[in-house]
């Protein structure tokens, strides 16, 4: 029995790697912000967009032939055919530097995406904050959702069968100053819901730690203020 053995040495340590589902195509991101693609399970490799600084990539969790390469500017690259071809679009701002997930995807429509980026963060800006936009055409046109956010995502999930147009945002109550200096308790993080693509907004919680989706449940961690009253006689 004959086996083929090929060795490829990447020029920097691997930071991220993932296959396209049910495919022989794999993406690898290196420490030097380069991305390589193999379409034959690693037998041969090709560097993608060598002139770009690529900070991360995302596979679409609901559409297995789609992936997105996030650069350090407002440009991102995407494929809709398992990496056979790549195109680019422009996001409304650079990817956020607050640790939030840059892209969120909808199970309802492959073209519905949410982008969370930096706004006003150049130099020593006093109003640096995260800003979320959504697109219904895979990034060709963007609409502002909310400023001063920590996270915005589609409410619907595979098992959480709510209004597919509803969006949830963790949004700071006071929208001024640099978000980098917000401390827990000083500026409440509200959970805001919005149906009809966030046009009909409503506050769900006044002060939250965060939310997550698990199966058919939406789980929210709320901040509870505890008051101690002492009726003491000295």
What are these regions (language model features)?
Residues 1-234:
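Extracellular glycan-interacting surfaces
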């Amino acid at each position: 029995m004959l086996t083929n053995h090929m060795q490829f040495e990447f020029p920097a340590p691997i930071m991220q790697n993932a296959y396209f589902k049910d495919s022989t195509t794999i993406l690898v991101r290196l420490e030097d912000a380069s991305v390589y693609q193999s379409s034959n399970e690693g037998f041969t490799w090709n560097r993608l967009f060598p002139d770009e600084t690529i900070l991360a990539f995302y596979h679409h969790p609901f559409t297995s032939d789609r992936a997105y390469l996030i650069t350090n500017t407002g440009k991102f690259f995407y494929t809709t055919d398992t990496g056979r071809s790549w195109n680019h679009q422009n996001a409304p701002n650079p990817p956020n530097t607050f640790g939030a997930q840059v892209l969120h995807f909808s199970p309802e429509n492959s073209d519905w995406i949410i982008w969370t980026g930096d706004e006003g963060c150049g130099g020593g800006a006093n109003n640096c904050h995260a800003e979320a936009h959504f697109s219904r055409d895979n990034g060709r046109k963007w609409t502002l959702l909310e400023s001063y956010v920590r996270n915005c995502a589609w409410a619907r999930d595979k098992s959480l069968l709510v209004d597919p147009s509803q969006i949830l945002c963790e949004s700071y109550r006071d929208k001024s100053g640099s978000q980098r200096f917000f401390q827990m308790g000083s500026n409440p993080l509200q959970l805001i819901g919005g149906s009809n693509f966030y046009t009909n907004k409503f506050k769900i919680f006044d002060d939250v730690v965060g939310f997550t989706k698990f199966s058919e449940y939406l789980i929210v961690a709320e901040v509870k203020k505890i008051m101690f009253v002492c009726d003491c006689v000295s």
